[in-house]
Structure formats: C-alpha cells, structure tokens
Regions:
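Terminal targeting/leader modules
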Residues: 1-2
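Internal, non-catalytic "lid/hinge" segments that mediate substrate recognition, gating
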Residues: 5-18, 32-35, 39-149
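Loop/turn positions that initiate beta-strands
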Residues: 23-25, 86-87
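Short hydrophobic beta-strand that contains or immediately precedes a catalytic carboxylate
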Residues: 27-29
Length: 149
C-alpha cells in the first residue's frame, strides 16, 4: 500500500492502516458479492444464446425478484440475439449435475431492443431465483480479462 503525505510517498502494509488514518475517519465495509447473472441457453437448433441479467422488471424490486419461486422477468443483454427467434430456450450447462437439469430453467423473450430485451425466466423446482442463478449462472467477467468465470 502506498501513502502520500506532504510530497512524500511511502510504502506500508495493510496492518499499518489505522496509524495512517485521521482519528475521525469513517471506514465503510463493502461485503457485496457479484451475482452469477450470466446464463447460457440453447435453442432446439443447437445455437447458444447468452443472457446477462441487468435489472429486474417484474417484480421490479431486487429482493423480491431474487426470492421469486416460479418466474420473474428481467432486462437482459442478449448475446447472439439474432439467433433467438422467440422460441423457448433451455438452460445449457455442459458441466451441470442433475439438480441443475431438474430445476428446468427456461427463458422466453418478451421483447427486444437491439442486443437487449425483456426475458421471462421460468423454472420448476420451487427454488428462489437467487438459488437458480447460483446453481446455473456464471460470474460476469469483463471481456478485456480474456478468461472465463
């Protein structure tokens, strides 16, 4: 860790942080997690469609949408969007165990605007949508990192 004071830069380790901060400093702890919101689906033809969940639409509250147990719709970025002709897509996960297959996650395109659209997700096993994403989704990794999640 580098610390700049009065025109001088010094190197420290993290445990030195308390002595470097002013007495009235406010520390904020960030315990957020990245949601595995990248889902890979497959058409009957075999074409793969990637759906990246951006924000919930129905229900529109994140907590309520993540707690949904049968269906919810989200605004999504759709990879390979031109190949999705409006048919029902089924989750594709070559590494899936039978629990992922049993949940029966499907995606229905309700509307599209270029590379994004409204997608209705339906599943059969009664799990919360947050659990569906944890089991079937992937962590979104920026393309410039040149690696998979």
């Amino acid at each position: 860790m580098l610390h700049y004071r009065k025109g001088e830069i010094k190197e420290y380790v993290f445990r030195d942080l308390p002595k470097l901060l002013p007495g009235d400093a406010l520390m904020v702890y960030n315990d957020t997690k990245v949601v595995p919101a990248r889902l890979l689906f497959q058409r009957e033809s075999g074409a793969h469609i990637e759906v990246f969940c951006l924000e919930p639409l129905s229900p529109s509250d994140y907590n309520i949408s993540f707690a949904s147990r049968e269906s919810c719709s989200w605004k999504c970025v759709i990879g390979n969007a031109k190949k999705w002709k409006g048919d029902v897509l089924h989750l594709y996960n070559p590494d899936a165990d039978e629990n992922i297959a049993r949940m029966g996650l499907e995606a229905v395109l309700l509307g599209r605007d270029g590379q994004s659209g409204e997608v209705l997700f339906r599943w059969k096993d009664g799990s919360a949508f947050s659990e569906v994403l944890e089991r079937g989704g992937r962590i979104p990794i920026p393309p410039y990192l040149n690696r998979e999640s």
